[in-house]
Amino acid sequence: MGIKIYNTLTRQKEEFKPLREGEVRMYVCGPTVYDYTHIGHARTYIAFDVIRRYLEHKGYTVLMVMNFTDIDDKIIKRANETGEDPKELAEKFLKYFLEDMKALKVKPADIYPRVTEHIQDIIDFIRKLQEKGYAYEGSDGVYFEVRKFKDYGKLSKVKLEDLVKGARVEPGEGKKNPEDFALWKKAKPGEPKWESPWGEGRPGWHIECSTMSTKYLGESFDIHGGGSDLIFPHHENEIAQTEACTGHEWVRYWMHTGFLMVNGEKMSKSLGNFVTIREALERYDPEVIRLFVLQRHYRSPLDYTEEGLEHAKNNLERLYNTLENIRVAMERAEISFKWGEEEFEAYEAIRDGRKKFYDAMDDDFNTAEALKAVFEVSNAINRYLTQVEKPKESILRKAWEFFKMVSEVFGIFEDYFREQKAGEEEALIKLLIDVRAQLRKERKFDLADKIRDELRNLGIQLEDTPQGTVWKRIKV
């Protein structure tokens, strides 16, 4: 069975078929960098990080783009409040965002395009819309004429007549109809501005993502993601302007994360009920936050509670205890000449757990169900280790490989496995140094030199000192 993805556009799960075999091109809406990023945002970016990791684990080459909105009404407003330069303010919070993502072990996007570095691309996109009759110039900017795009509402299921009902154009607005949205905003005194065919100004919000995604991923690509709050109007407007420009389908699969809730309300800066990522990281390990997010399906609402985070913390400790139990047991493990009932039970638990994990992740990246499989394997291995005096090396190796796979997909245990690998490498190097010393004692210098030379080819340089042989890593 292949991967199935819930497509917001069709409101159903669909078999995942990328446009290009073996390659996935995906775009995730990035932040407007005017403040610290909160845990609600972290939920979205961790979810798409795991989706990307799983696609890569399944053998796809993934090209991932995430934009930065570094000029916007919110940035200008905050800069006016603080007295900072809007560019410097945006640069500061962009840097903080990247630091937060690194702390949360979210893999960097392949490309992070910034709005301010793509102004000419945006102008060119708007001109195409004008040429095709979808955009017009008003007194205060350039607008997209929504009524001319016949498929408007296909993502959000919003009806145009409902938008128009009771709405009106505010005095001073230069648009024809209340539902039309800005593509280019003419500059107000003191605002950042760029030259354009319509006078000095800056881009509207929605046009940025259409321009930058098509520039780097093409006029059609596989996945567009973001939080559920972006479905309307942002993603709806993106579809309208992009498909009006290109004349064909833009994105094949639309994916949206559920809200992070606090006391029954969506966590948001506007409601003032948010916890920044930095505040959360002061209290909890990054892997606790990742596990907290993964305990719920990415489309389901997630309640932000101390109890939930403590539960994730305890679960993470349980899994680390299992890893340590396996590592320690390796020291007394024996080669398998025959299996008993305990080995067959442990093997079947690992086999079944792996299948359940893949089945869950193939079913619209259901991390909650996949985690259940992880704990089933964890419990089975701990039970096995209490049942036998000398565990079989083959069983422990299969369990170890299972948890390495989980680490690769979920982005947890990565430092642990890295340290274990480093420890194994050091032990092997020490063994080779001891073998080489023995060969030198036996005057088998050719073989001793071969060990030295081969290690050097691998980036390990041996140095013979009066105190013994030492080693260091070198570039080769």
Curated annotation (Swiss-Prot):
Keyword Protein biosynthesis annotated: yes
Residue positions binding ATP: 269
InterPro entries linked to this entry: Cys-tRNA-ligase (IPR015803), Cys-tRNA-synt_Ia_DALR (IPR015273), Cys-tRNA/MSH_ligase (IPR024909), Rossmann-like_a/b/a_fold (IPR014729), tRNA-synt_1_cat_dom (IPR032678), tRNAsynth_Ia_anticodon-bd (IPR009080)
Keywords: Aminoacyl-tRNA synthetase, ATP-binding, Cytoplasm, Ligase, Metal-binding, Nucleotide-binding, Protein biosynthesis, Zinc
Binding site for Zn(2+): 29, 209, 234, 238
Motif interval(s): 'KMSKS' region: 266-270
EC number, as in UniProt: 6.1.1.16
Subcellular location: Cytoplasm
EC class: ligase
Bilayer-spanning residue ranges: none
Cellular component annotations (GO), alphabetically ordered: cytoplasm
Reactions mediated catalytically: tRNA(Cys) + L-cysteine + ATP = L-cysteinyl-tRNA(Cys) + AMP + diphosphate
Chief location: cytoplasm
Gene Ontology molecular function: any one: cysteine-tRNA ligase activity
Record-level GO BP terms: cysteinyl-tRNA aminoacylation
Motif 'HIGH' region per record, residues: 31-41
One Pfam entry name: DALR_2
Cofactor requirements of the protein: Zn(2+)
Entries under Gene3D superfamilies matching the protein: Cysteine-tRNA ligase, C-terminal anti-codon recognition domain, HUPs
Cofactor binding note from Swiss-Prot or TrEMBL: Binds 1 zinc ion per subunit.
Sequence similarity: Belongs to the class-I aminoacyl-tRNA synthetase family.
NCBIfam families: cysS
Protein name, as recorded: Cysteine--tRNA ligase
Organism for this UniProt entry: Thermococcus kodakarensis (strain ATCC BAA-918 / JCM 12380 / KOD1) (Pyrococcus kodakaraensis (strain KOD1))
Gene designation per UniProt: cysS
